[in-house]
Amino acid sequence: MQFHKYDVVIVGAGGAGMRAAIESGQRARTAVLTKLYPTRSHTGAAQGGMCAALANVEEDNWEWHTFDTIKGGDYLVDQDAAEIMAKEAIDAVLDLEKMGLPFNRTPEGKIDQRRFGGHTRDHGKAAVRRACYAADRTGHMILQTLYQNCVKHGTEFFNEFYVLDVNLTPDENGNPVATGVVAYELATGELHVFHAKAIVFASGGAGKIFKTTSNAHTLTGDGLGIIFRKGLPLEDMEFFQFHPTGLAGLGILISEAVRGEGGILRNVDGERFMERYAPTIKDLAPRDIVARSMVQEVLQGRGCGPNKDYVVLDVTHIPEETLNAKLPDIMEFSRTYLGVDPVTEPVPVFPTCHYVMGGIPTNIHGEALRDNENVIPGLYAAGEVACVSVHGSNRLGTNSLLDINVFGRRAGIAAAEYALGHDFVEMPENPTTVVEDQLSLLLSEHGNERVADIRTELQATMDSHASVYRTEETLKQALTDVQALKDRYQRITVADKGKRYNTDLLEAVELGFLLELAEVLVVGALARKESRGGHAREDYPNRDDTNFMRHTMAYKEGEGLRSEIRLDYKPVTFTRYEPMERKY
């Protein structure tokens, strides 16, 4: 076991983690722990753009952006946070430009902008060009740019260090204070304790709960699971976004930028069906609306292909030079994975799990909450692992790359300033006990269940029973299945007993997180008897502001996987926009 001491420890090296590290590292001694090499983080898979009301191409302002974010989130957005994000978006983009990010340019040399779903001018009157982009590799460019700047500032990275626990020390009133993390070094199997004044979780989402997902194999909700197991709340975990355009049968992302450049969704009759569902902005309606519309087309017999189980994305009317210049990766993905050339034929697409709107509840400074009001001193979160909540029940495209930059920066500054103003708090007497017990149990010979089998069954039941459309019946079936899988998880066997690069062991750990988070999702979805944003109940098809204009707060009660989930609720913050009917 090795001990380390830093002012600030950041867990995760994607966009939010590295943006926080740039700010924190210039103010306090900072370490970044990541289970992946930083430039392999999932931020690199984001394609379409990062929005800001620069008004380089069309008239725009941050207030319209705020309104679109709130309406897009079906009014479950904390409006103070949305205002901050929209206001600070402009500087966030310009900061990246100064760091060297190669944005596409207008003929005049300004940052170019394109249309994206749900982004409008003058409170919904027409689509607006707000997304700043670097071809269809915007996330990749952001990741590379942030990493270069971390290296420039001398950020200390601990690569392939898998954080498995956060240490919390009670203060004089018995309330938790963050004091460190415990990490497993993949190369050696050794445990490392990082004593810190401030900890920032930026560990990403949990899309691998589902089979059909745009998420990488590594997005297993580790940070969410660690926090949940400490008895701390997770907010709005029933709200998962299903991106409308995943490659059919695979889930690989086809960016919304394709529709922003003029791509059209069509059914088996060749009809542009989104004209029926969203007459004003059609294919550029928010993602939850487009995804549900696509599923409805299939359910009503208008799907394409031999099994009529997908729709198509048509770009054959767009010049080939435009496609190659602005959407090169999308062209390659379609040809490589489906054998379809978008220049000459439409691309088969269907919704794919993409993003979790919920997460660790935080305030606008990135400080993590232990209940509806009180923060945990020294604990911060940013990015997809966090819930500010700027996305409400449905995130708008391009707001995620914005979120990681705005709130990653804020969390990094706040964590460093907290660390500079406080002394180290003593860690628990045996900081590695929880992790040692967890790993020992997984490595012991106590069963014959395989991790891969349980994970496959979990993902299949979540795809079938808790995805785009849900009912009481399907959710109860999902809950029964997940709880049965949790019982089987107690009897798993890990074949590799070695210490070096034991990925079998870590996949077993990840599966434990996925099982718990799947249950949190289903329990929250069962309790929310309405349809809002990414949560669509066929048995409760309408939004119910009277009973459910509130954030779900899920707490773990008891120890181990057989513990109960307690739900509480937190009010939504309103500043200027009252809820109204959501039409596009």
What is each of the regions a protein language model found here?
Residues A198-I252, G397-A414:
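Glycine-rich loop(s) and the adjacent beta-strand/alpha-helix scaffold that form part
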Residues M1-Y6, G15, E23, Y37-T39, ...:
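Glycine- and aromatic-enriched mobile tails/lids
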Residues I226, L232-P348, A414-L420, R455, ...:
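An anion/pyrophosphate-binding glycine-rich loop and adjacent beta-alpha core
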Residues E97-E190, H195, A202, H243-L250, ...:
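Conserved redox-cofactor binding core of oxidoreductases
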Residues M1-V8, Q26-R27, N175-P176, L186:
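Extreme N-terminal leader/targeting segments of oxidoreductases
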Residues V77-I90, R129-Q148, F158, T213-G221, ...:
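Short beta-strand to alpha-helix junction loop
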Residues A52-M85:
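Glycine-rich active-site loop/strand segments that organize a redox cofactor
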Residues V8-V32:
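N-terminal Rossmann-like FAD-binding beta1-loop-alpha1 element of flavoenzymes
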